[in-house]
């Protein structure tokens, strides 16, 4: 087994989990699945078990970070691991490079209709496929169509994408310009219906599109075979880099270092205020993936407290860049004594077109099958009332074709969060100083220090690992 990059981070947690892990082992002849999403419980109970009544399956659901800690500690002991593991995107490469998965042989023909990025992201160092995903998770910009009409005079998807500059070279510049226009048009006394509208609820919604669309991930291999910390220029270099957009959105109509009037609502990403904004009239849009339509927007469109309901007032269009967010891959552990049965279960969930079609129809999930999704996209009768009758499958199918999945690394779970923290600090001139040039260097250096602390044994750092123009 290869050296685990996460050993140092999890050694303390291992002592806390020893007694708990002893109770988590496999039971008899059951196939054991560990997952962070309760979707798999439904998929097993309502679909797989009905089609495969002779196969007993035990699904154990954990919070995503707790699952990562549990898996890491089980890997250290080599015991108590499940047969099948559901992996969230940010942990995918870590587990693959830890070499704990069995290659999934003989399925390449059946996976031909999957989106390329889901395949590319889940190959081991020998180029063998070790995990498959049942869903694809293209990201887009969900926006309020009533606000677009009232504040911007926009009545069509095409007009919205032109205003955003979607997939154009200057797309983030147009995004910031739109944020400023929304603020102007909704200023006090300007509009009777919508006042003080912000383009986003939380500024760090922009992180995922930047991370997904960058050319290089957090590490590249040098001639000596070492992993070298890499900060893609799109994250920090020049106008409308990720750090620069953070600054512009958080400064808003103010001045750097002397008071800010942000273009965002300054909520905390995926906390209560962020969800509450989905039912209010203060936020214009959200950068979300396909699954968030059903699990986030629909679930929070009606406020219990105020009675306000934004259902039917949303549309979805291309974001400034093509990106993906999250997703779930399934893999067979190489410690399993039920590898054949486990692979058949994964084949059912990711390649059985009857199941995938039913699942997509029943849940609205955007599934990892081009043939089925293209049929949904072309169906004139298929529309989403929540999106004012829009057929969102056509848009998601187009976005998913643009993704490649080649920039994921073992470091993503920690370094994505760390860089986002310093991007926020830089945009608010918090802990970095309020002189623009030195603040940028301080933010980058602070991030580099955090990376060195987290991965001192597995990540080489040049001095410095960035180039300022």
Question: What is each stretch, according to the model?
Answer:
Residues 301-374:
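Extracytoplasmic/periplasmic substrate-recognition and gating elements
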Residues 87-143, 149, 306-318, 331, ...:
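Hinge/lid segment of periplasmic solute-binding proteins
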Residues 1-7:
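Positively charged n-region of N-terminal signal peptides that target proteins for export
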Residues 176-180, 222-270, 310-315:
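Glycine-centered hinge/linker elements that transmit conformational signals in sensory
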Residues 6, 17-93, 109-112, 155, ...:
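Conserved N-terminal structural module of periplasmic/extracytoplasmic solute-binding proteins
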Residues 68-81, 98, 148, 174-186, ...:
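Short helices/loops that flank or line small-molecule/ion binding pockets
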Residues 374, 380-388, 393-469:
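Conserved C-terminal helix/tail region of periplasmic/extracytoplasmic solute-binding proteins
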Residues 126-135, 139, 168-232:
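Extracytoplasmic/periplasmic solute-binding protein
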């Amino acid at each position: 087994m290869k050296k685990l990059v996460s050993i140092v981070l999890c050694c303390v947690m291992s002592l806390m989990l020893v007694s708990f892990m002893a109770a988590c082992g496999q039971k008899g002849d059951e196939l054991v699945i560990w997952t962070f999403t309760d979707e798999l419980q439904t998929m097993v109970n309502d679909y797989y078990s009905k089609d495969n009544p002779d196969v007993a399956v035990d699904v154990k659901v954990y919070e995503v970070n707790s699952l990562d800690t549990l898996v890491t500690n089980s890997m250290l002991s080599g015991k108590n691991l499940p047969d099948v593991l559901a992996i969230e995107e940010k942990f995918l490469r870590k587990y693959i490079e830890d070499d704990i998965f069995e290659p999934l042989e003989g399925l390449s023909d059946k996976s031909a209709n999957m989106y390329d990025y889901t395949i590319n992201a889940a190959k081991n160092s020998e180029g063998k496929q070790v995990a498959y995903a049942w869903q694809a998770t293209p990201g887009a910009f969900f926006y309020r169509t009533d606000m677009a009409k009232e504040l911007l005079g926009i009545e069509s998807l095409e007009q919205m994408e032109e205003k955003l500059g979607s997939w154009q070279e200057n797309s983030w510049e147009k995004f910031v310009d739109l944020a400023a226009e929304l603020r102007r048009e909704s200023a006090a006394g300007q509009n009777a219906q919508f006042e003080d509208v912000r383009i986003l609820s939380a500024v760090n919604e922009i992180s995922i599109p930047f991370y997904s669309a960058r050319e290089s991930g957090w590490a590249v291999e040098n001639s000596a075979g070492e992993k070298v910390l890499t900060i893609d220029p799109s994250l920090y270099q020049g106008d409308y880099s990720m750090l620069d957009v953070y600054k512009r959105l958080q400064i808003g109509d103010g001045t750097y270092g002397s008071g800010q009037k942000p273009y965002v609502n300054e909520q905390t990403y995926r906390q209560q205020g962020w969800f509450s904004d989905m039912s209010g009239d203060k936020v214009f849009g959200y950068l979300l993936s396909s699954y968030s339509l059903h699990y986030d927007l629909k679930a929070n469109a009606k406020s219990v407290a105020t009675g306000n309901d934004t259902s039917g007032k949303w549309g979805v269009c291309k974001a400034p860049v093509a990106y993906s967010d999250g997703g779930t891959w399934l893999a067979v552990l190489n410690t399993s004594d039920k590898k054949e049965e486990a692979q058949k279960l994964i084949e059912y969930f990711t390649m059985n077109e009857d199941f995938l079609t039913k699942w997509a129809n029943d849940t609205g999930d955007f599934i990892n099958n081009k043939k089925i999704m293209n049929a949904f996209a072309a169906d004139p009768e298929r529309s989403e009332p929540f999106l004012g009758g829009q057929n969102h499958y056509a848009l998601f199918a187009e976005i998913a074709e643009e993704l490649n999945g080649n920039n994921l690394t073992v470091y993503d779970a920690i370094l994505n969060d760390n860089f986002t923290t310093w991007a926020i600090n830089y945009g608010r001139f918090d802990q970095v100083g309020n002189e623009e040039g030195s603040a940028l260097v301080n933010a980058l250096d602070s991030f580099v220090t955090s990376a060195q602390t987290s991965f001192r044994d597995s990540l080489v750092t040049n001095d410095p690992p960035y180039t300022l123009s």
